[in-house]
Amino acid sequence: MCLLGVSAPTVASYDASAPMSTASNGDVDIAYRVVGDPQAEPILIIMGLSASHRVWNPQLITGLAEGGYRVVLLDNRDVGESSKIEKKGRLWLAWQLLKYRIGLRVKSPYALSDMAVDAVAVLDALEIERAHVIGASMGGMIGQIVAYDFPQRTQSLVSIMSTTWAPHLPQPGRAQQDGISEMNESSEEQAADLQKLGFYPSALPNQVTAILSAGDRTARVAQISAPTLVLHGADDQLLSVEHGEHTAQTIKDAQFKVYENMGHNLPDPIIPQMVNDMLAHLRANPI
């Protein structure tokens, strides 16, 4: 595969079914796998709400690995093969969402900052001092926290379809909120089918409230010093393009790119260009 006009050696294809390794953050075990040359510069890549690492587009993972990088994928706590935390019920999430809408404090079993420490624990397990960090949606929020809480571990940042959660930004549409509620109300059979696709409805109460309880992180995001690339879809109905624009405006010297025909997802047609954009950013900021 040749990207950006630079040839790279062929690496093993991304196999999401291969056995995973485990890192520990206290009592929490975080499952991870590595794709690509073990001697190459590392990329830590973090997926979003209720989704395991298997949700990443294989073409994107393989493209980054064949571009000359060691790609480290993890399952956030509560999804995939990582530890499952105290399970909260559907009614509990509905109550927390109602409190958020009327301006009351939202409670969560853990914080996004805890999930950032989980990610750093994976770097520790692999004895990686510095890494490029890529995150999508909630994973982008976690990546931002890694960048501002652990600047010494962050070589560069790519924040995809994510947000600072500033209060002036458009809230998710009713259809998108209803979609999250419907997933939260999945039957056991529906949940099993979703898990086959890499989604874990059981994680929603804990992770949604982790996002909401974090609130506006604009002041902290402004502290990010790592070179940053912000990517967003023009058609994103969950986190509108204004969220990506504000993230890029908040981080000094951040680059911002919008993809047409991309919503809150990673559609196949845009992956080759996205990989090229990521590789250009990574190569401009080597470890």
Question: Where are the regions that the model predicts?
Answer:
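Conserved HGGG/HGGXW glycine-rich cap/lid loop of the alpha/beta-hydrolase fold
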Residues: 28-98
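Conserved acidic catalytic loop of the alpha/beta-hydrolase fold
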Residues: 101, 109, 113-131
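Conserved alpha/beta-hydrolase "nucleophile elbow" surrounding the catalytic nucleophile
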Residues: 131, 135-137, 233
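Flexible "cap/lid" loop of the alpha/beta hydrolase fold
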Residues: 141-148, 157-184
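Active-site nucleophile elbow and catalytic-triad environment of alpha/beta-hydrolase enzymes
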Residues: 204-220
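Short beta-strand/loop motif that positions the catalytic acidic residue
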Residues: 224, 230-232
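Conserved alpha/beta-hydrolase "acid-adjacent" motif
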Residues: 237-243
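Catalytic active-site module of serine/aspartate enzymes centered on a nucleophile-bearing elbow/loop
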Residues: 254-287
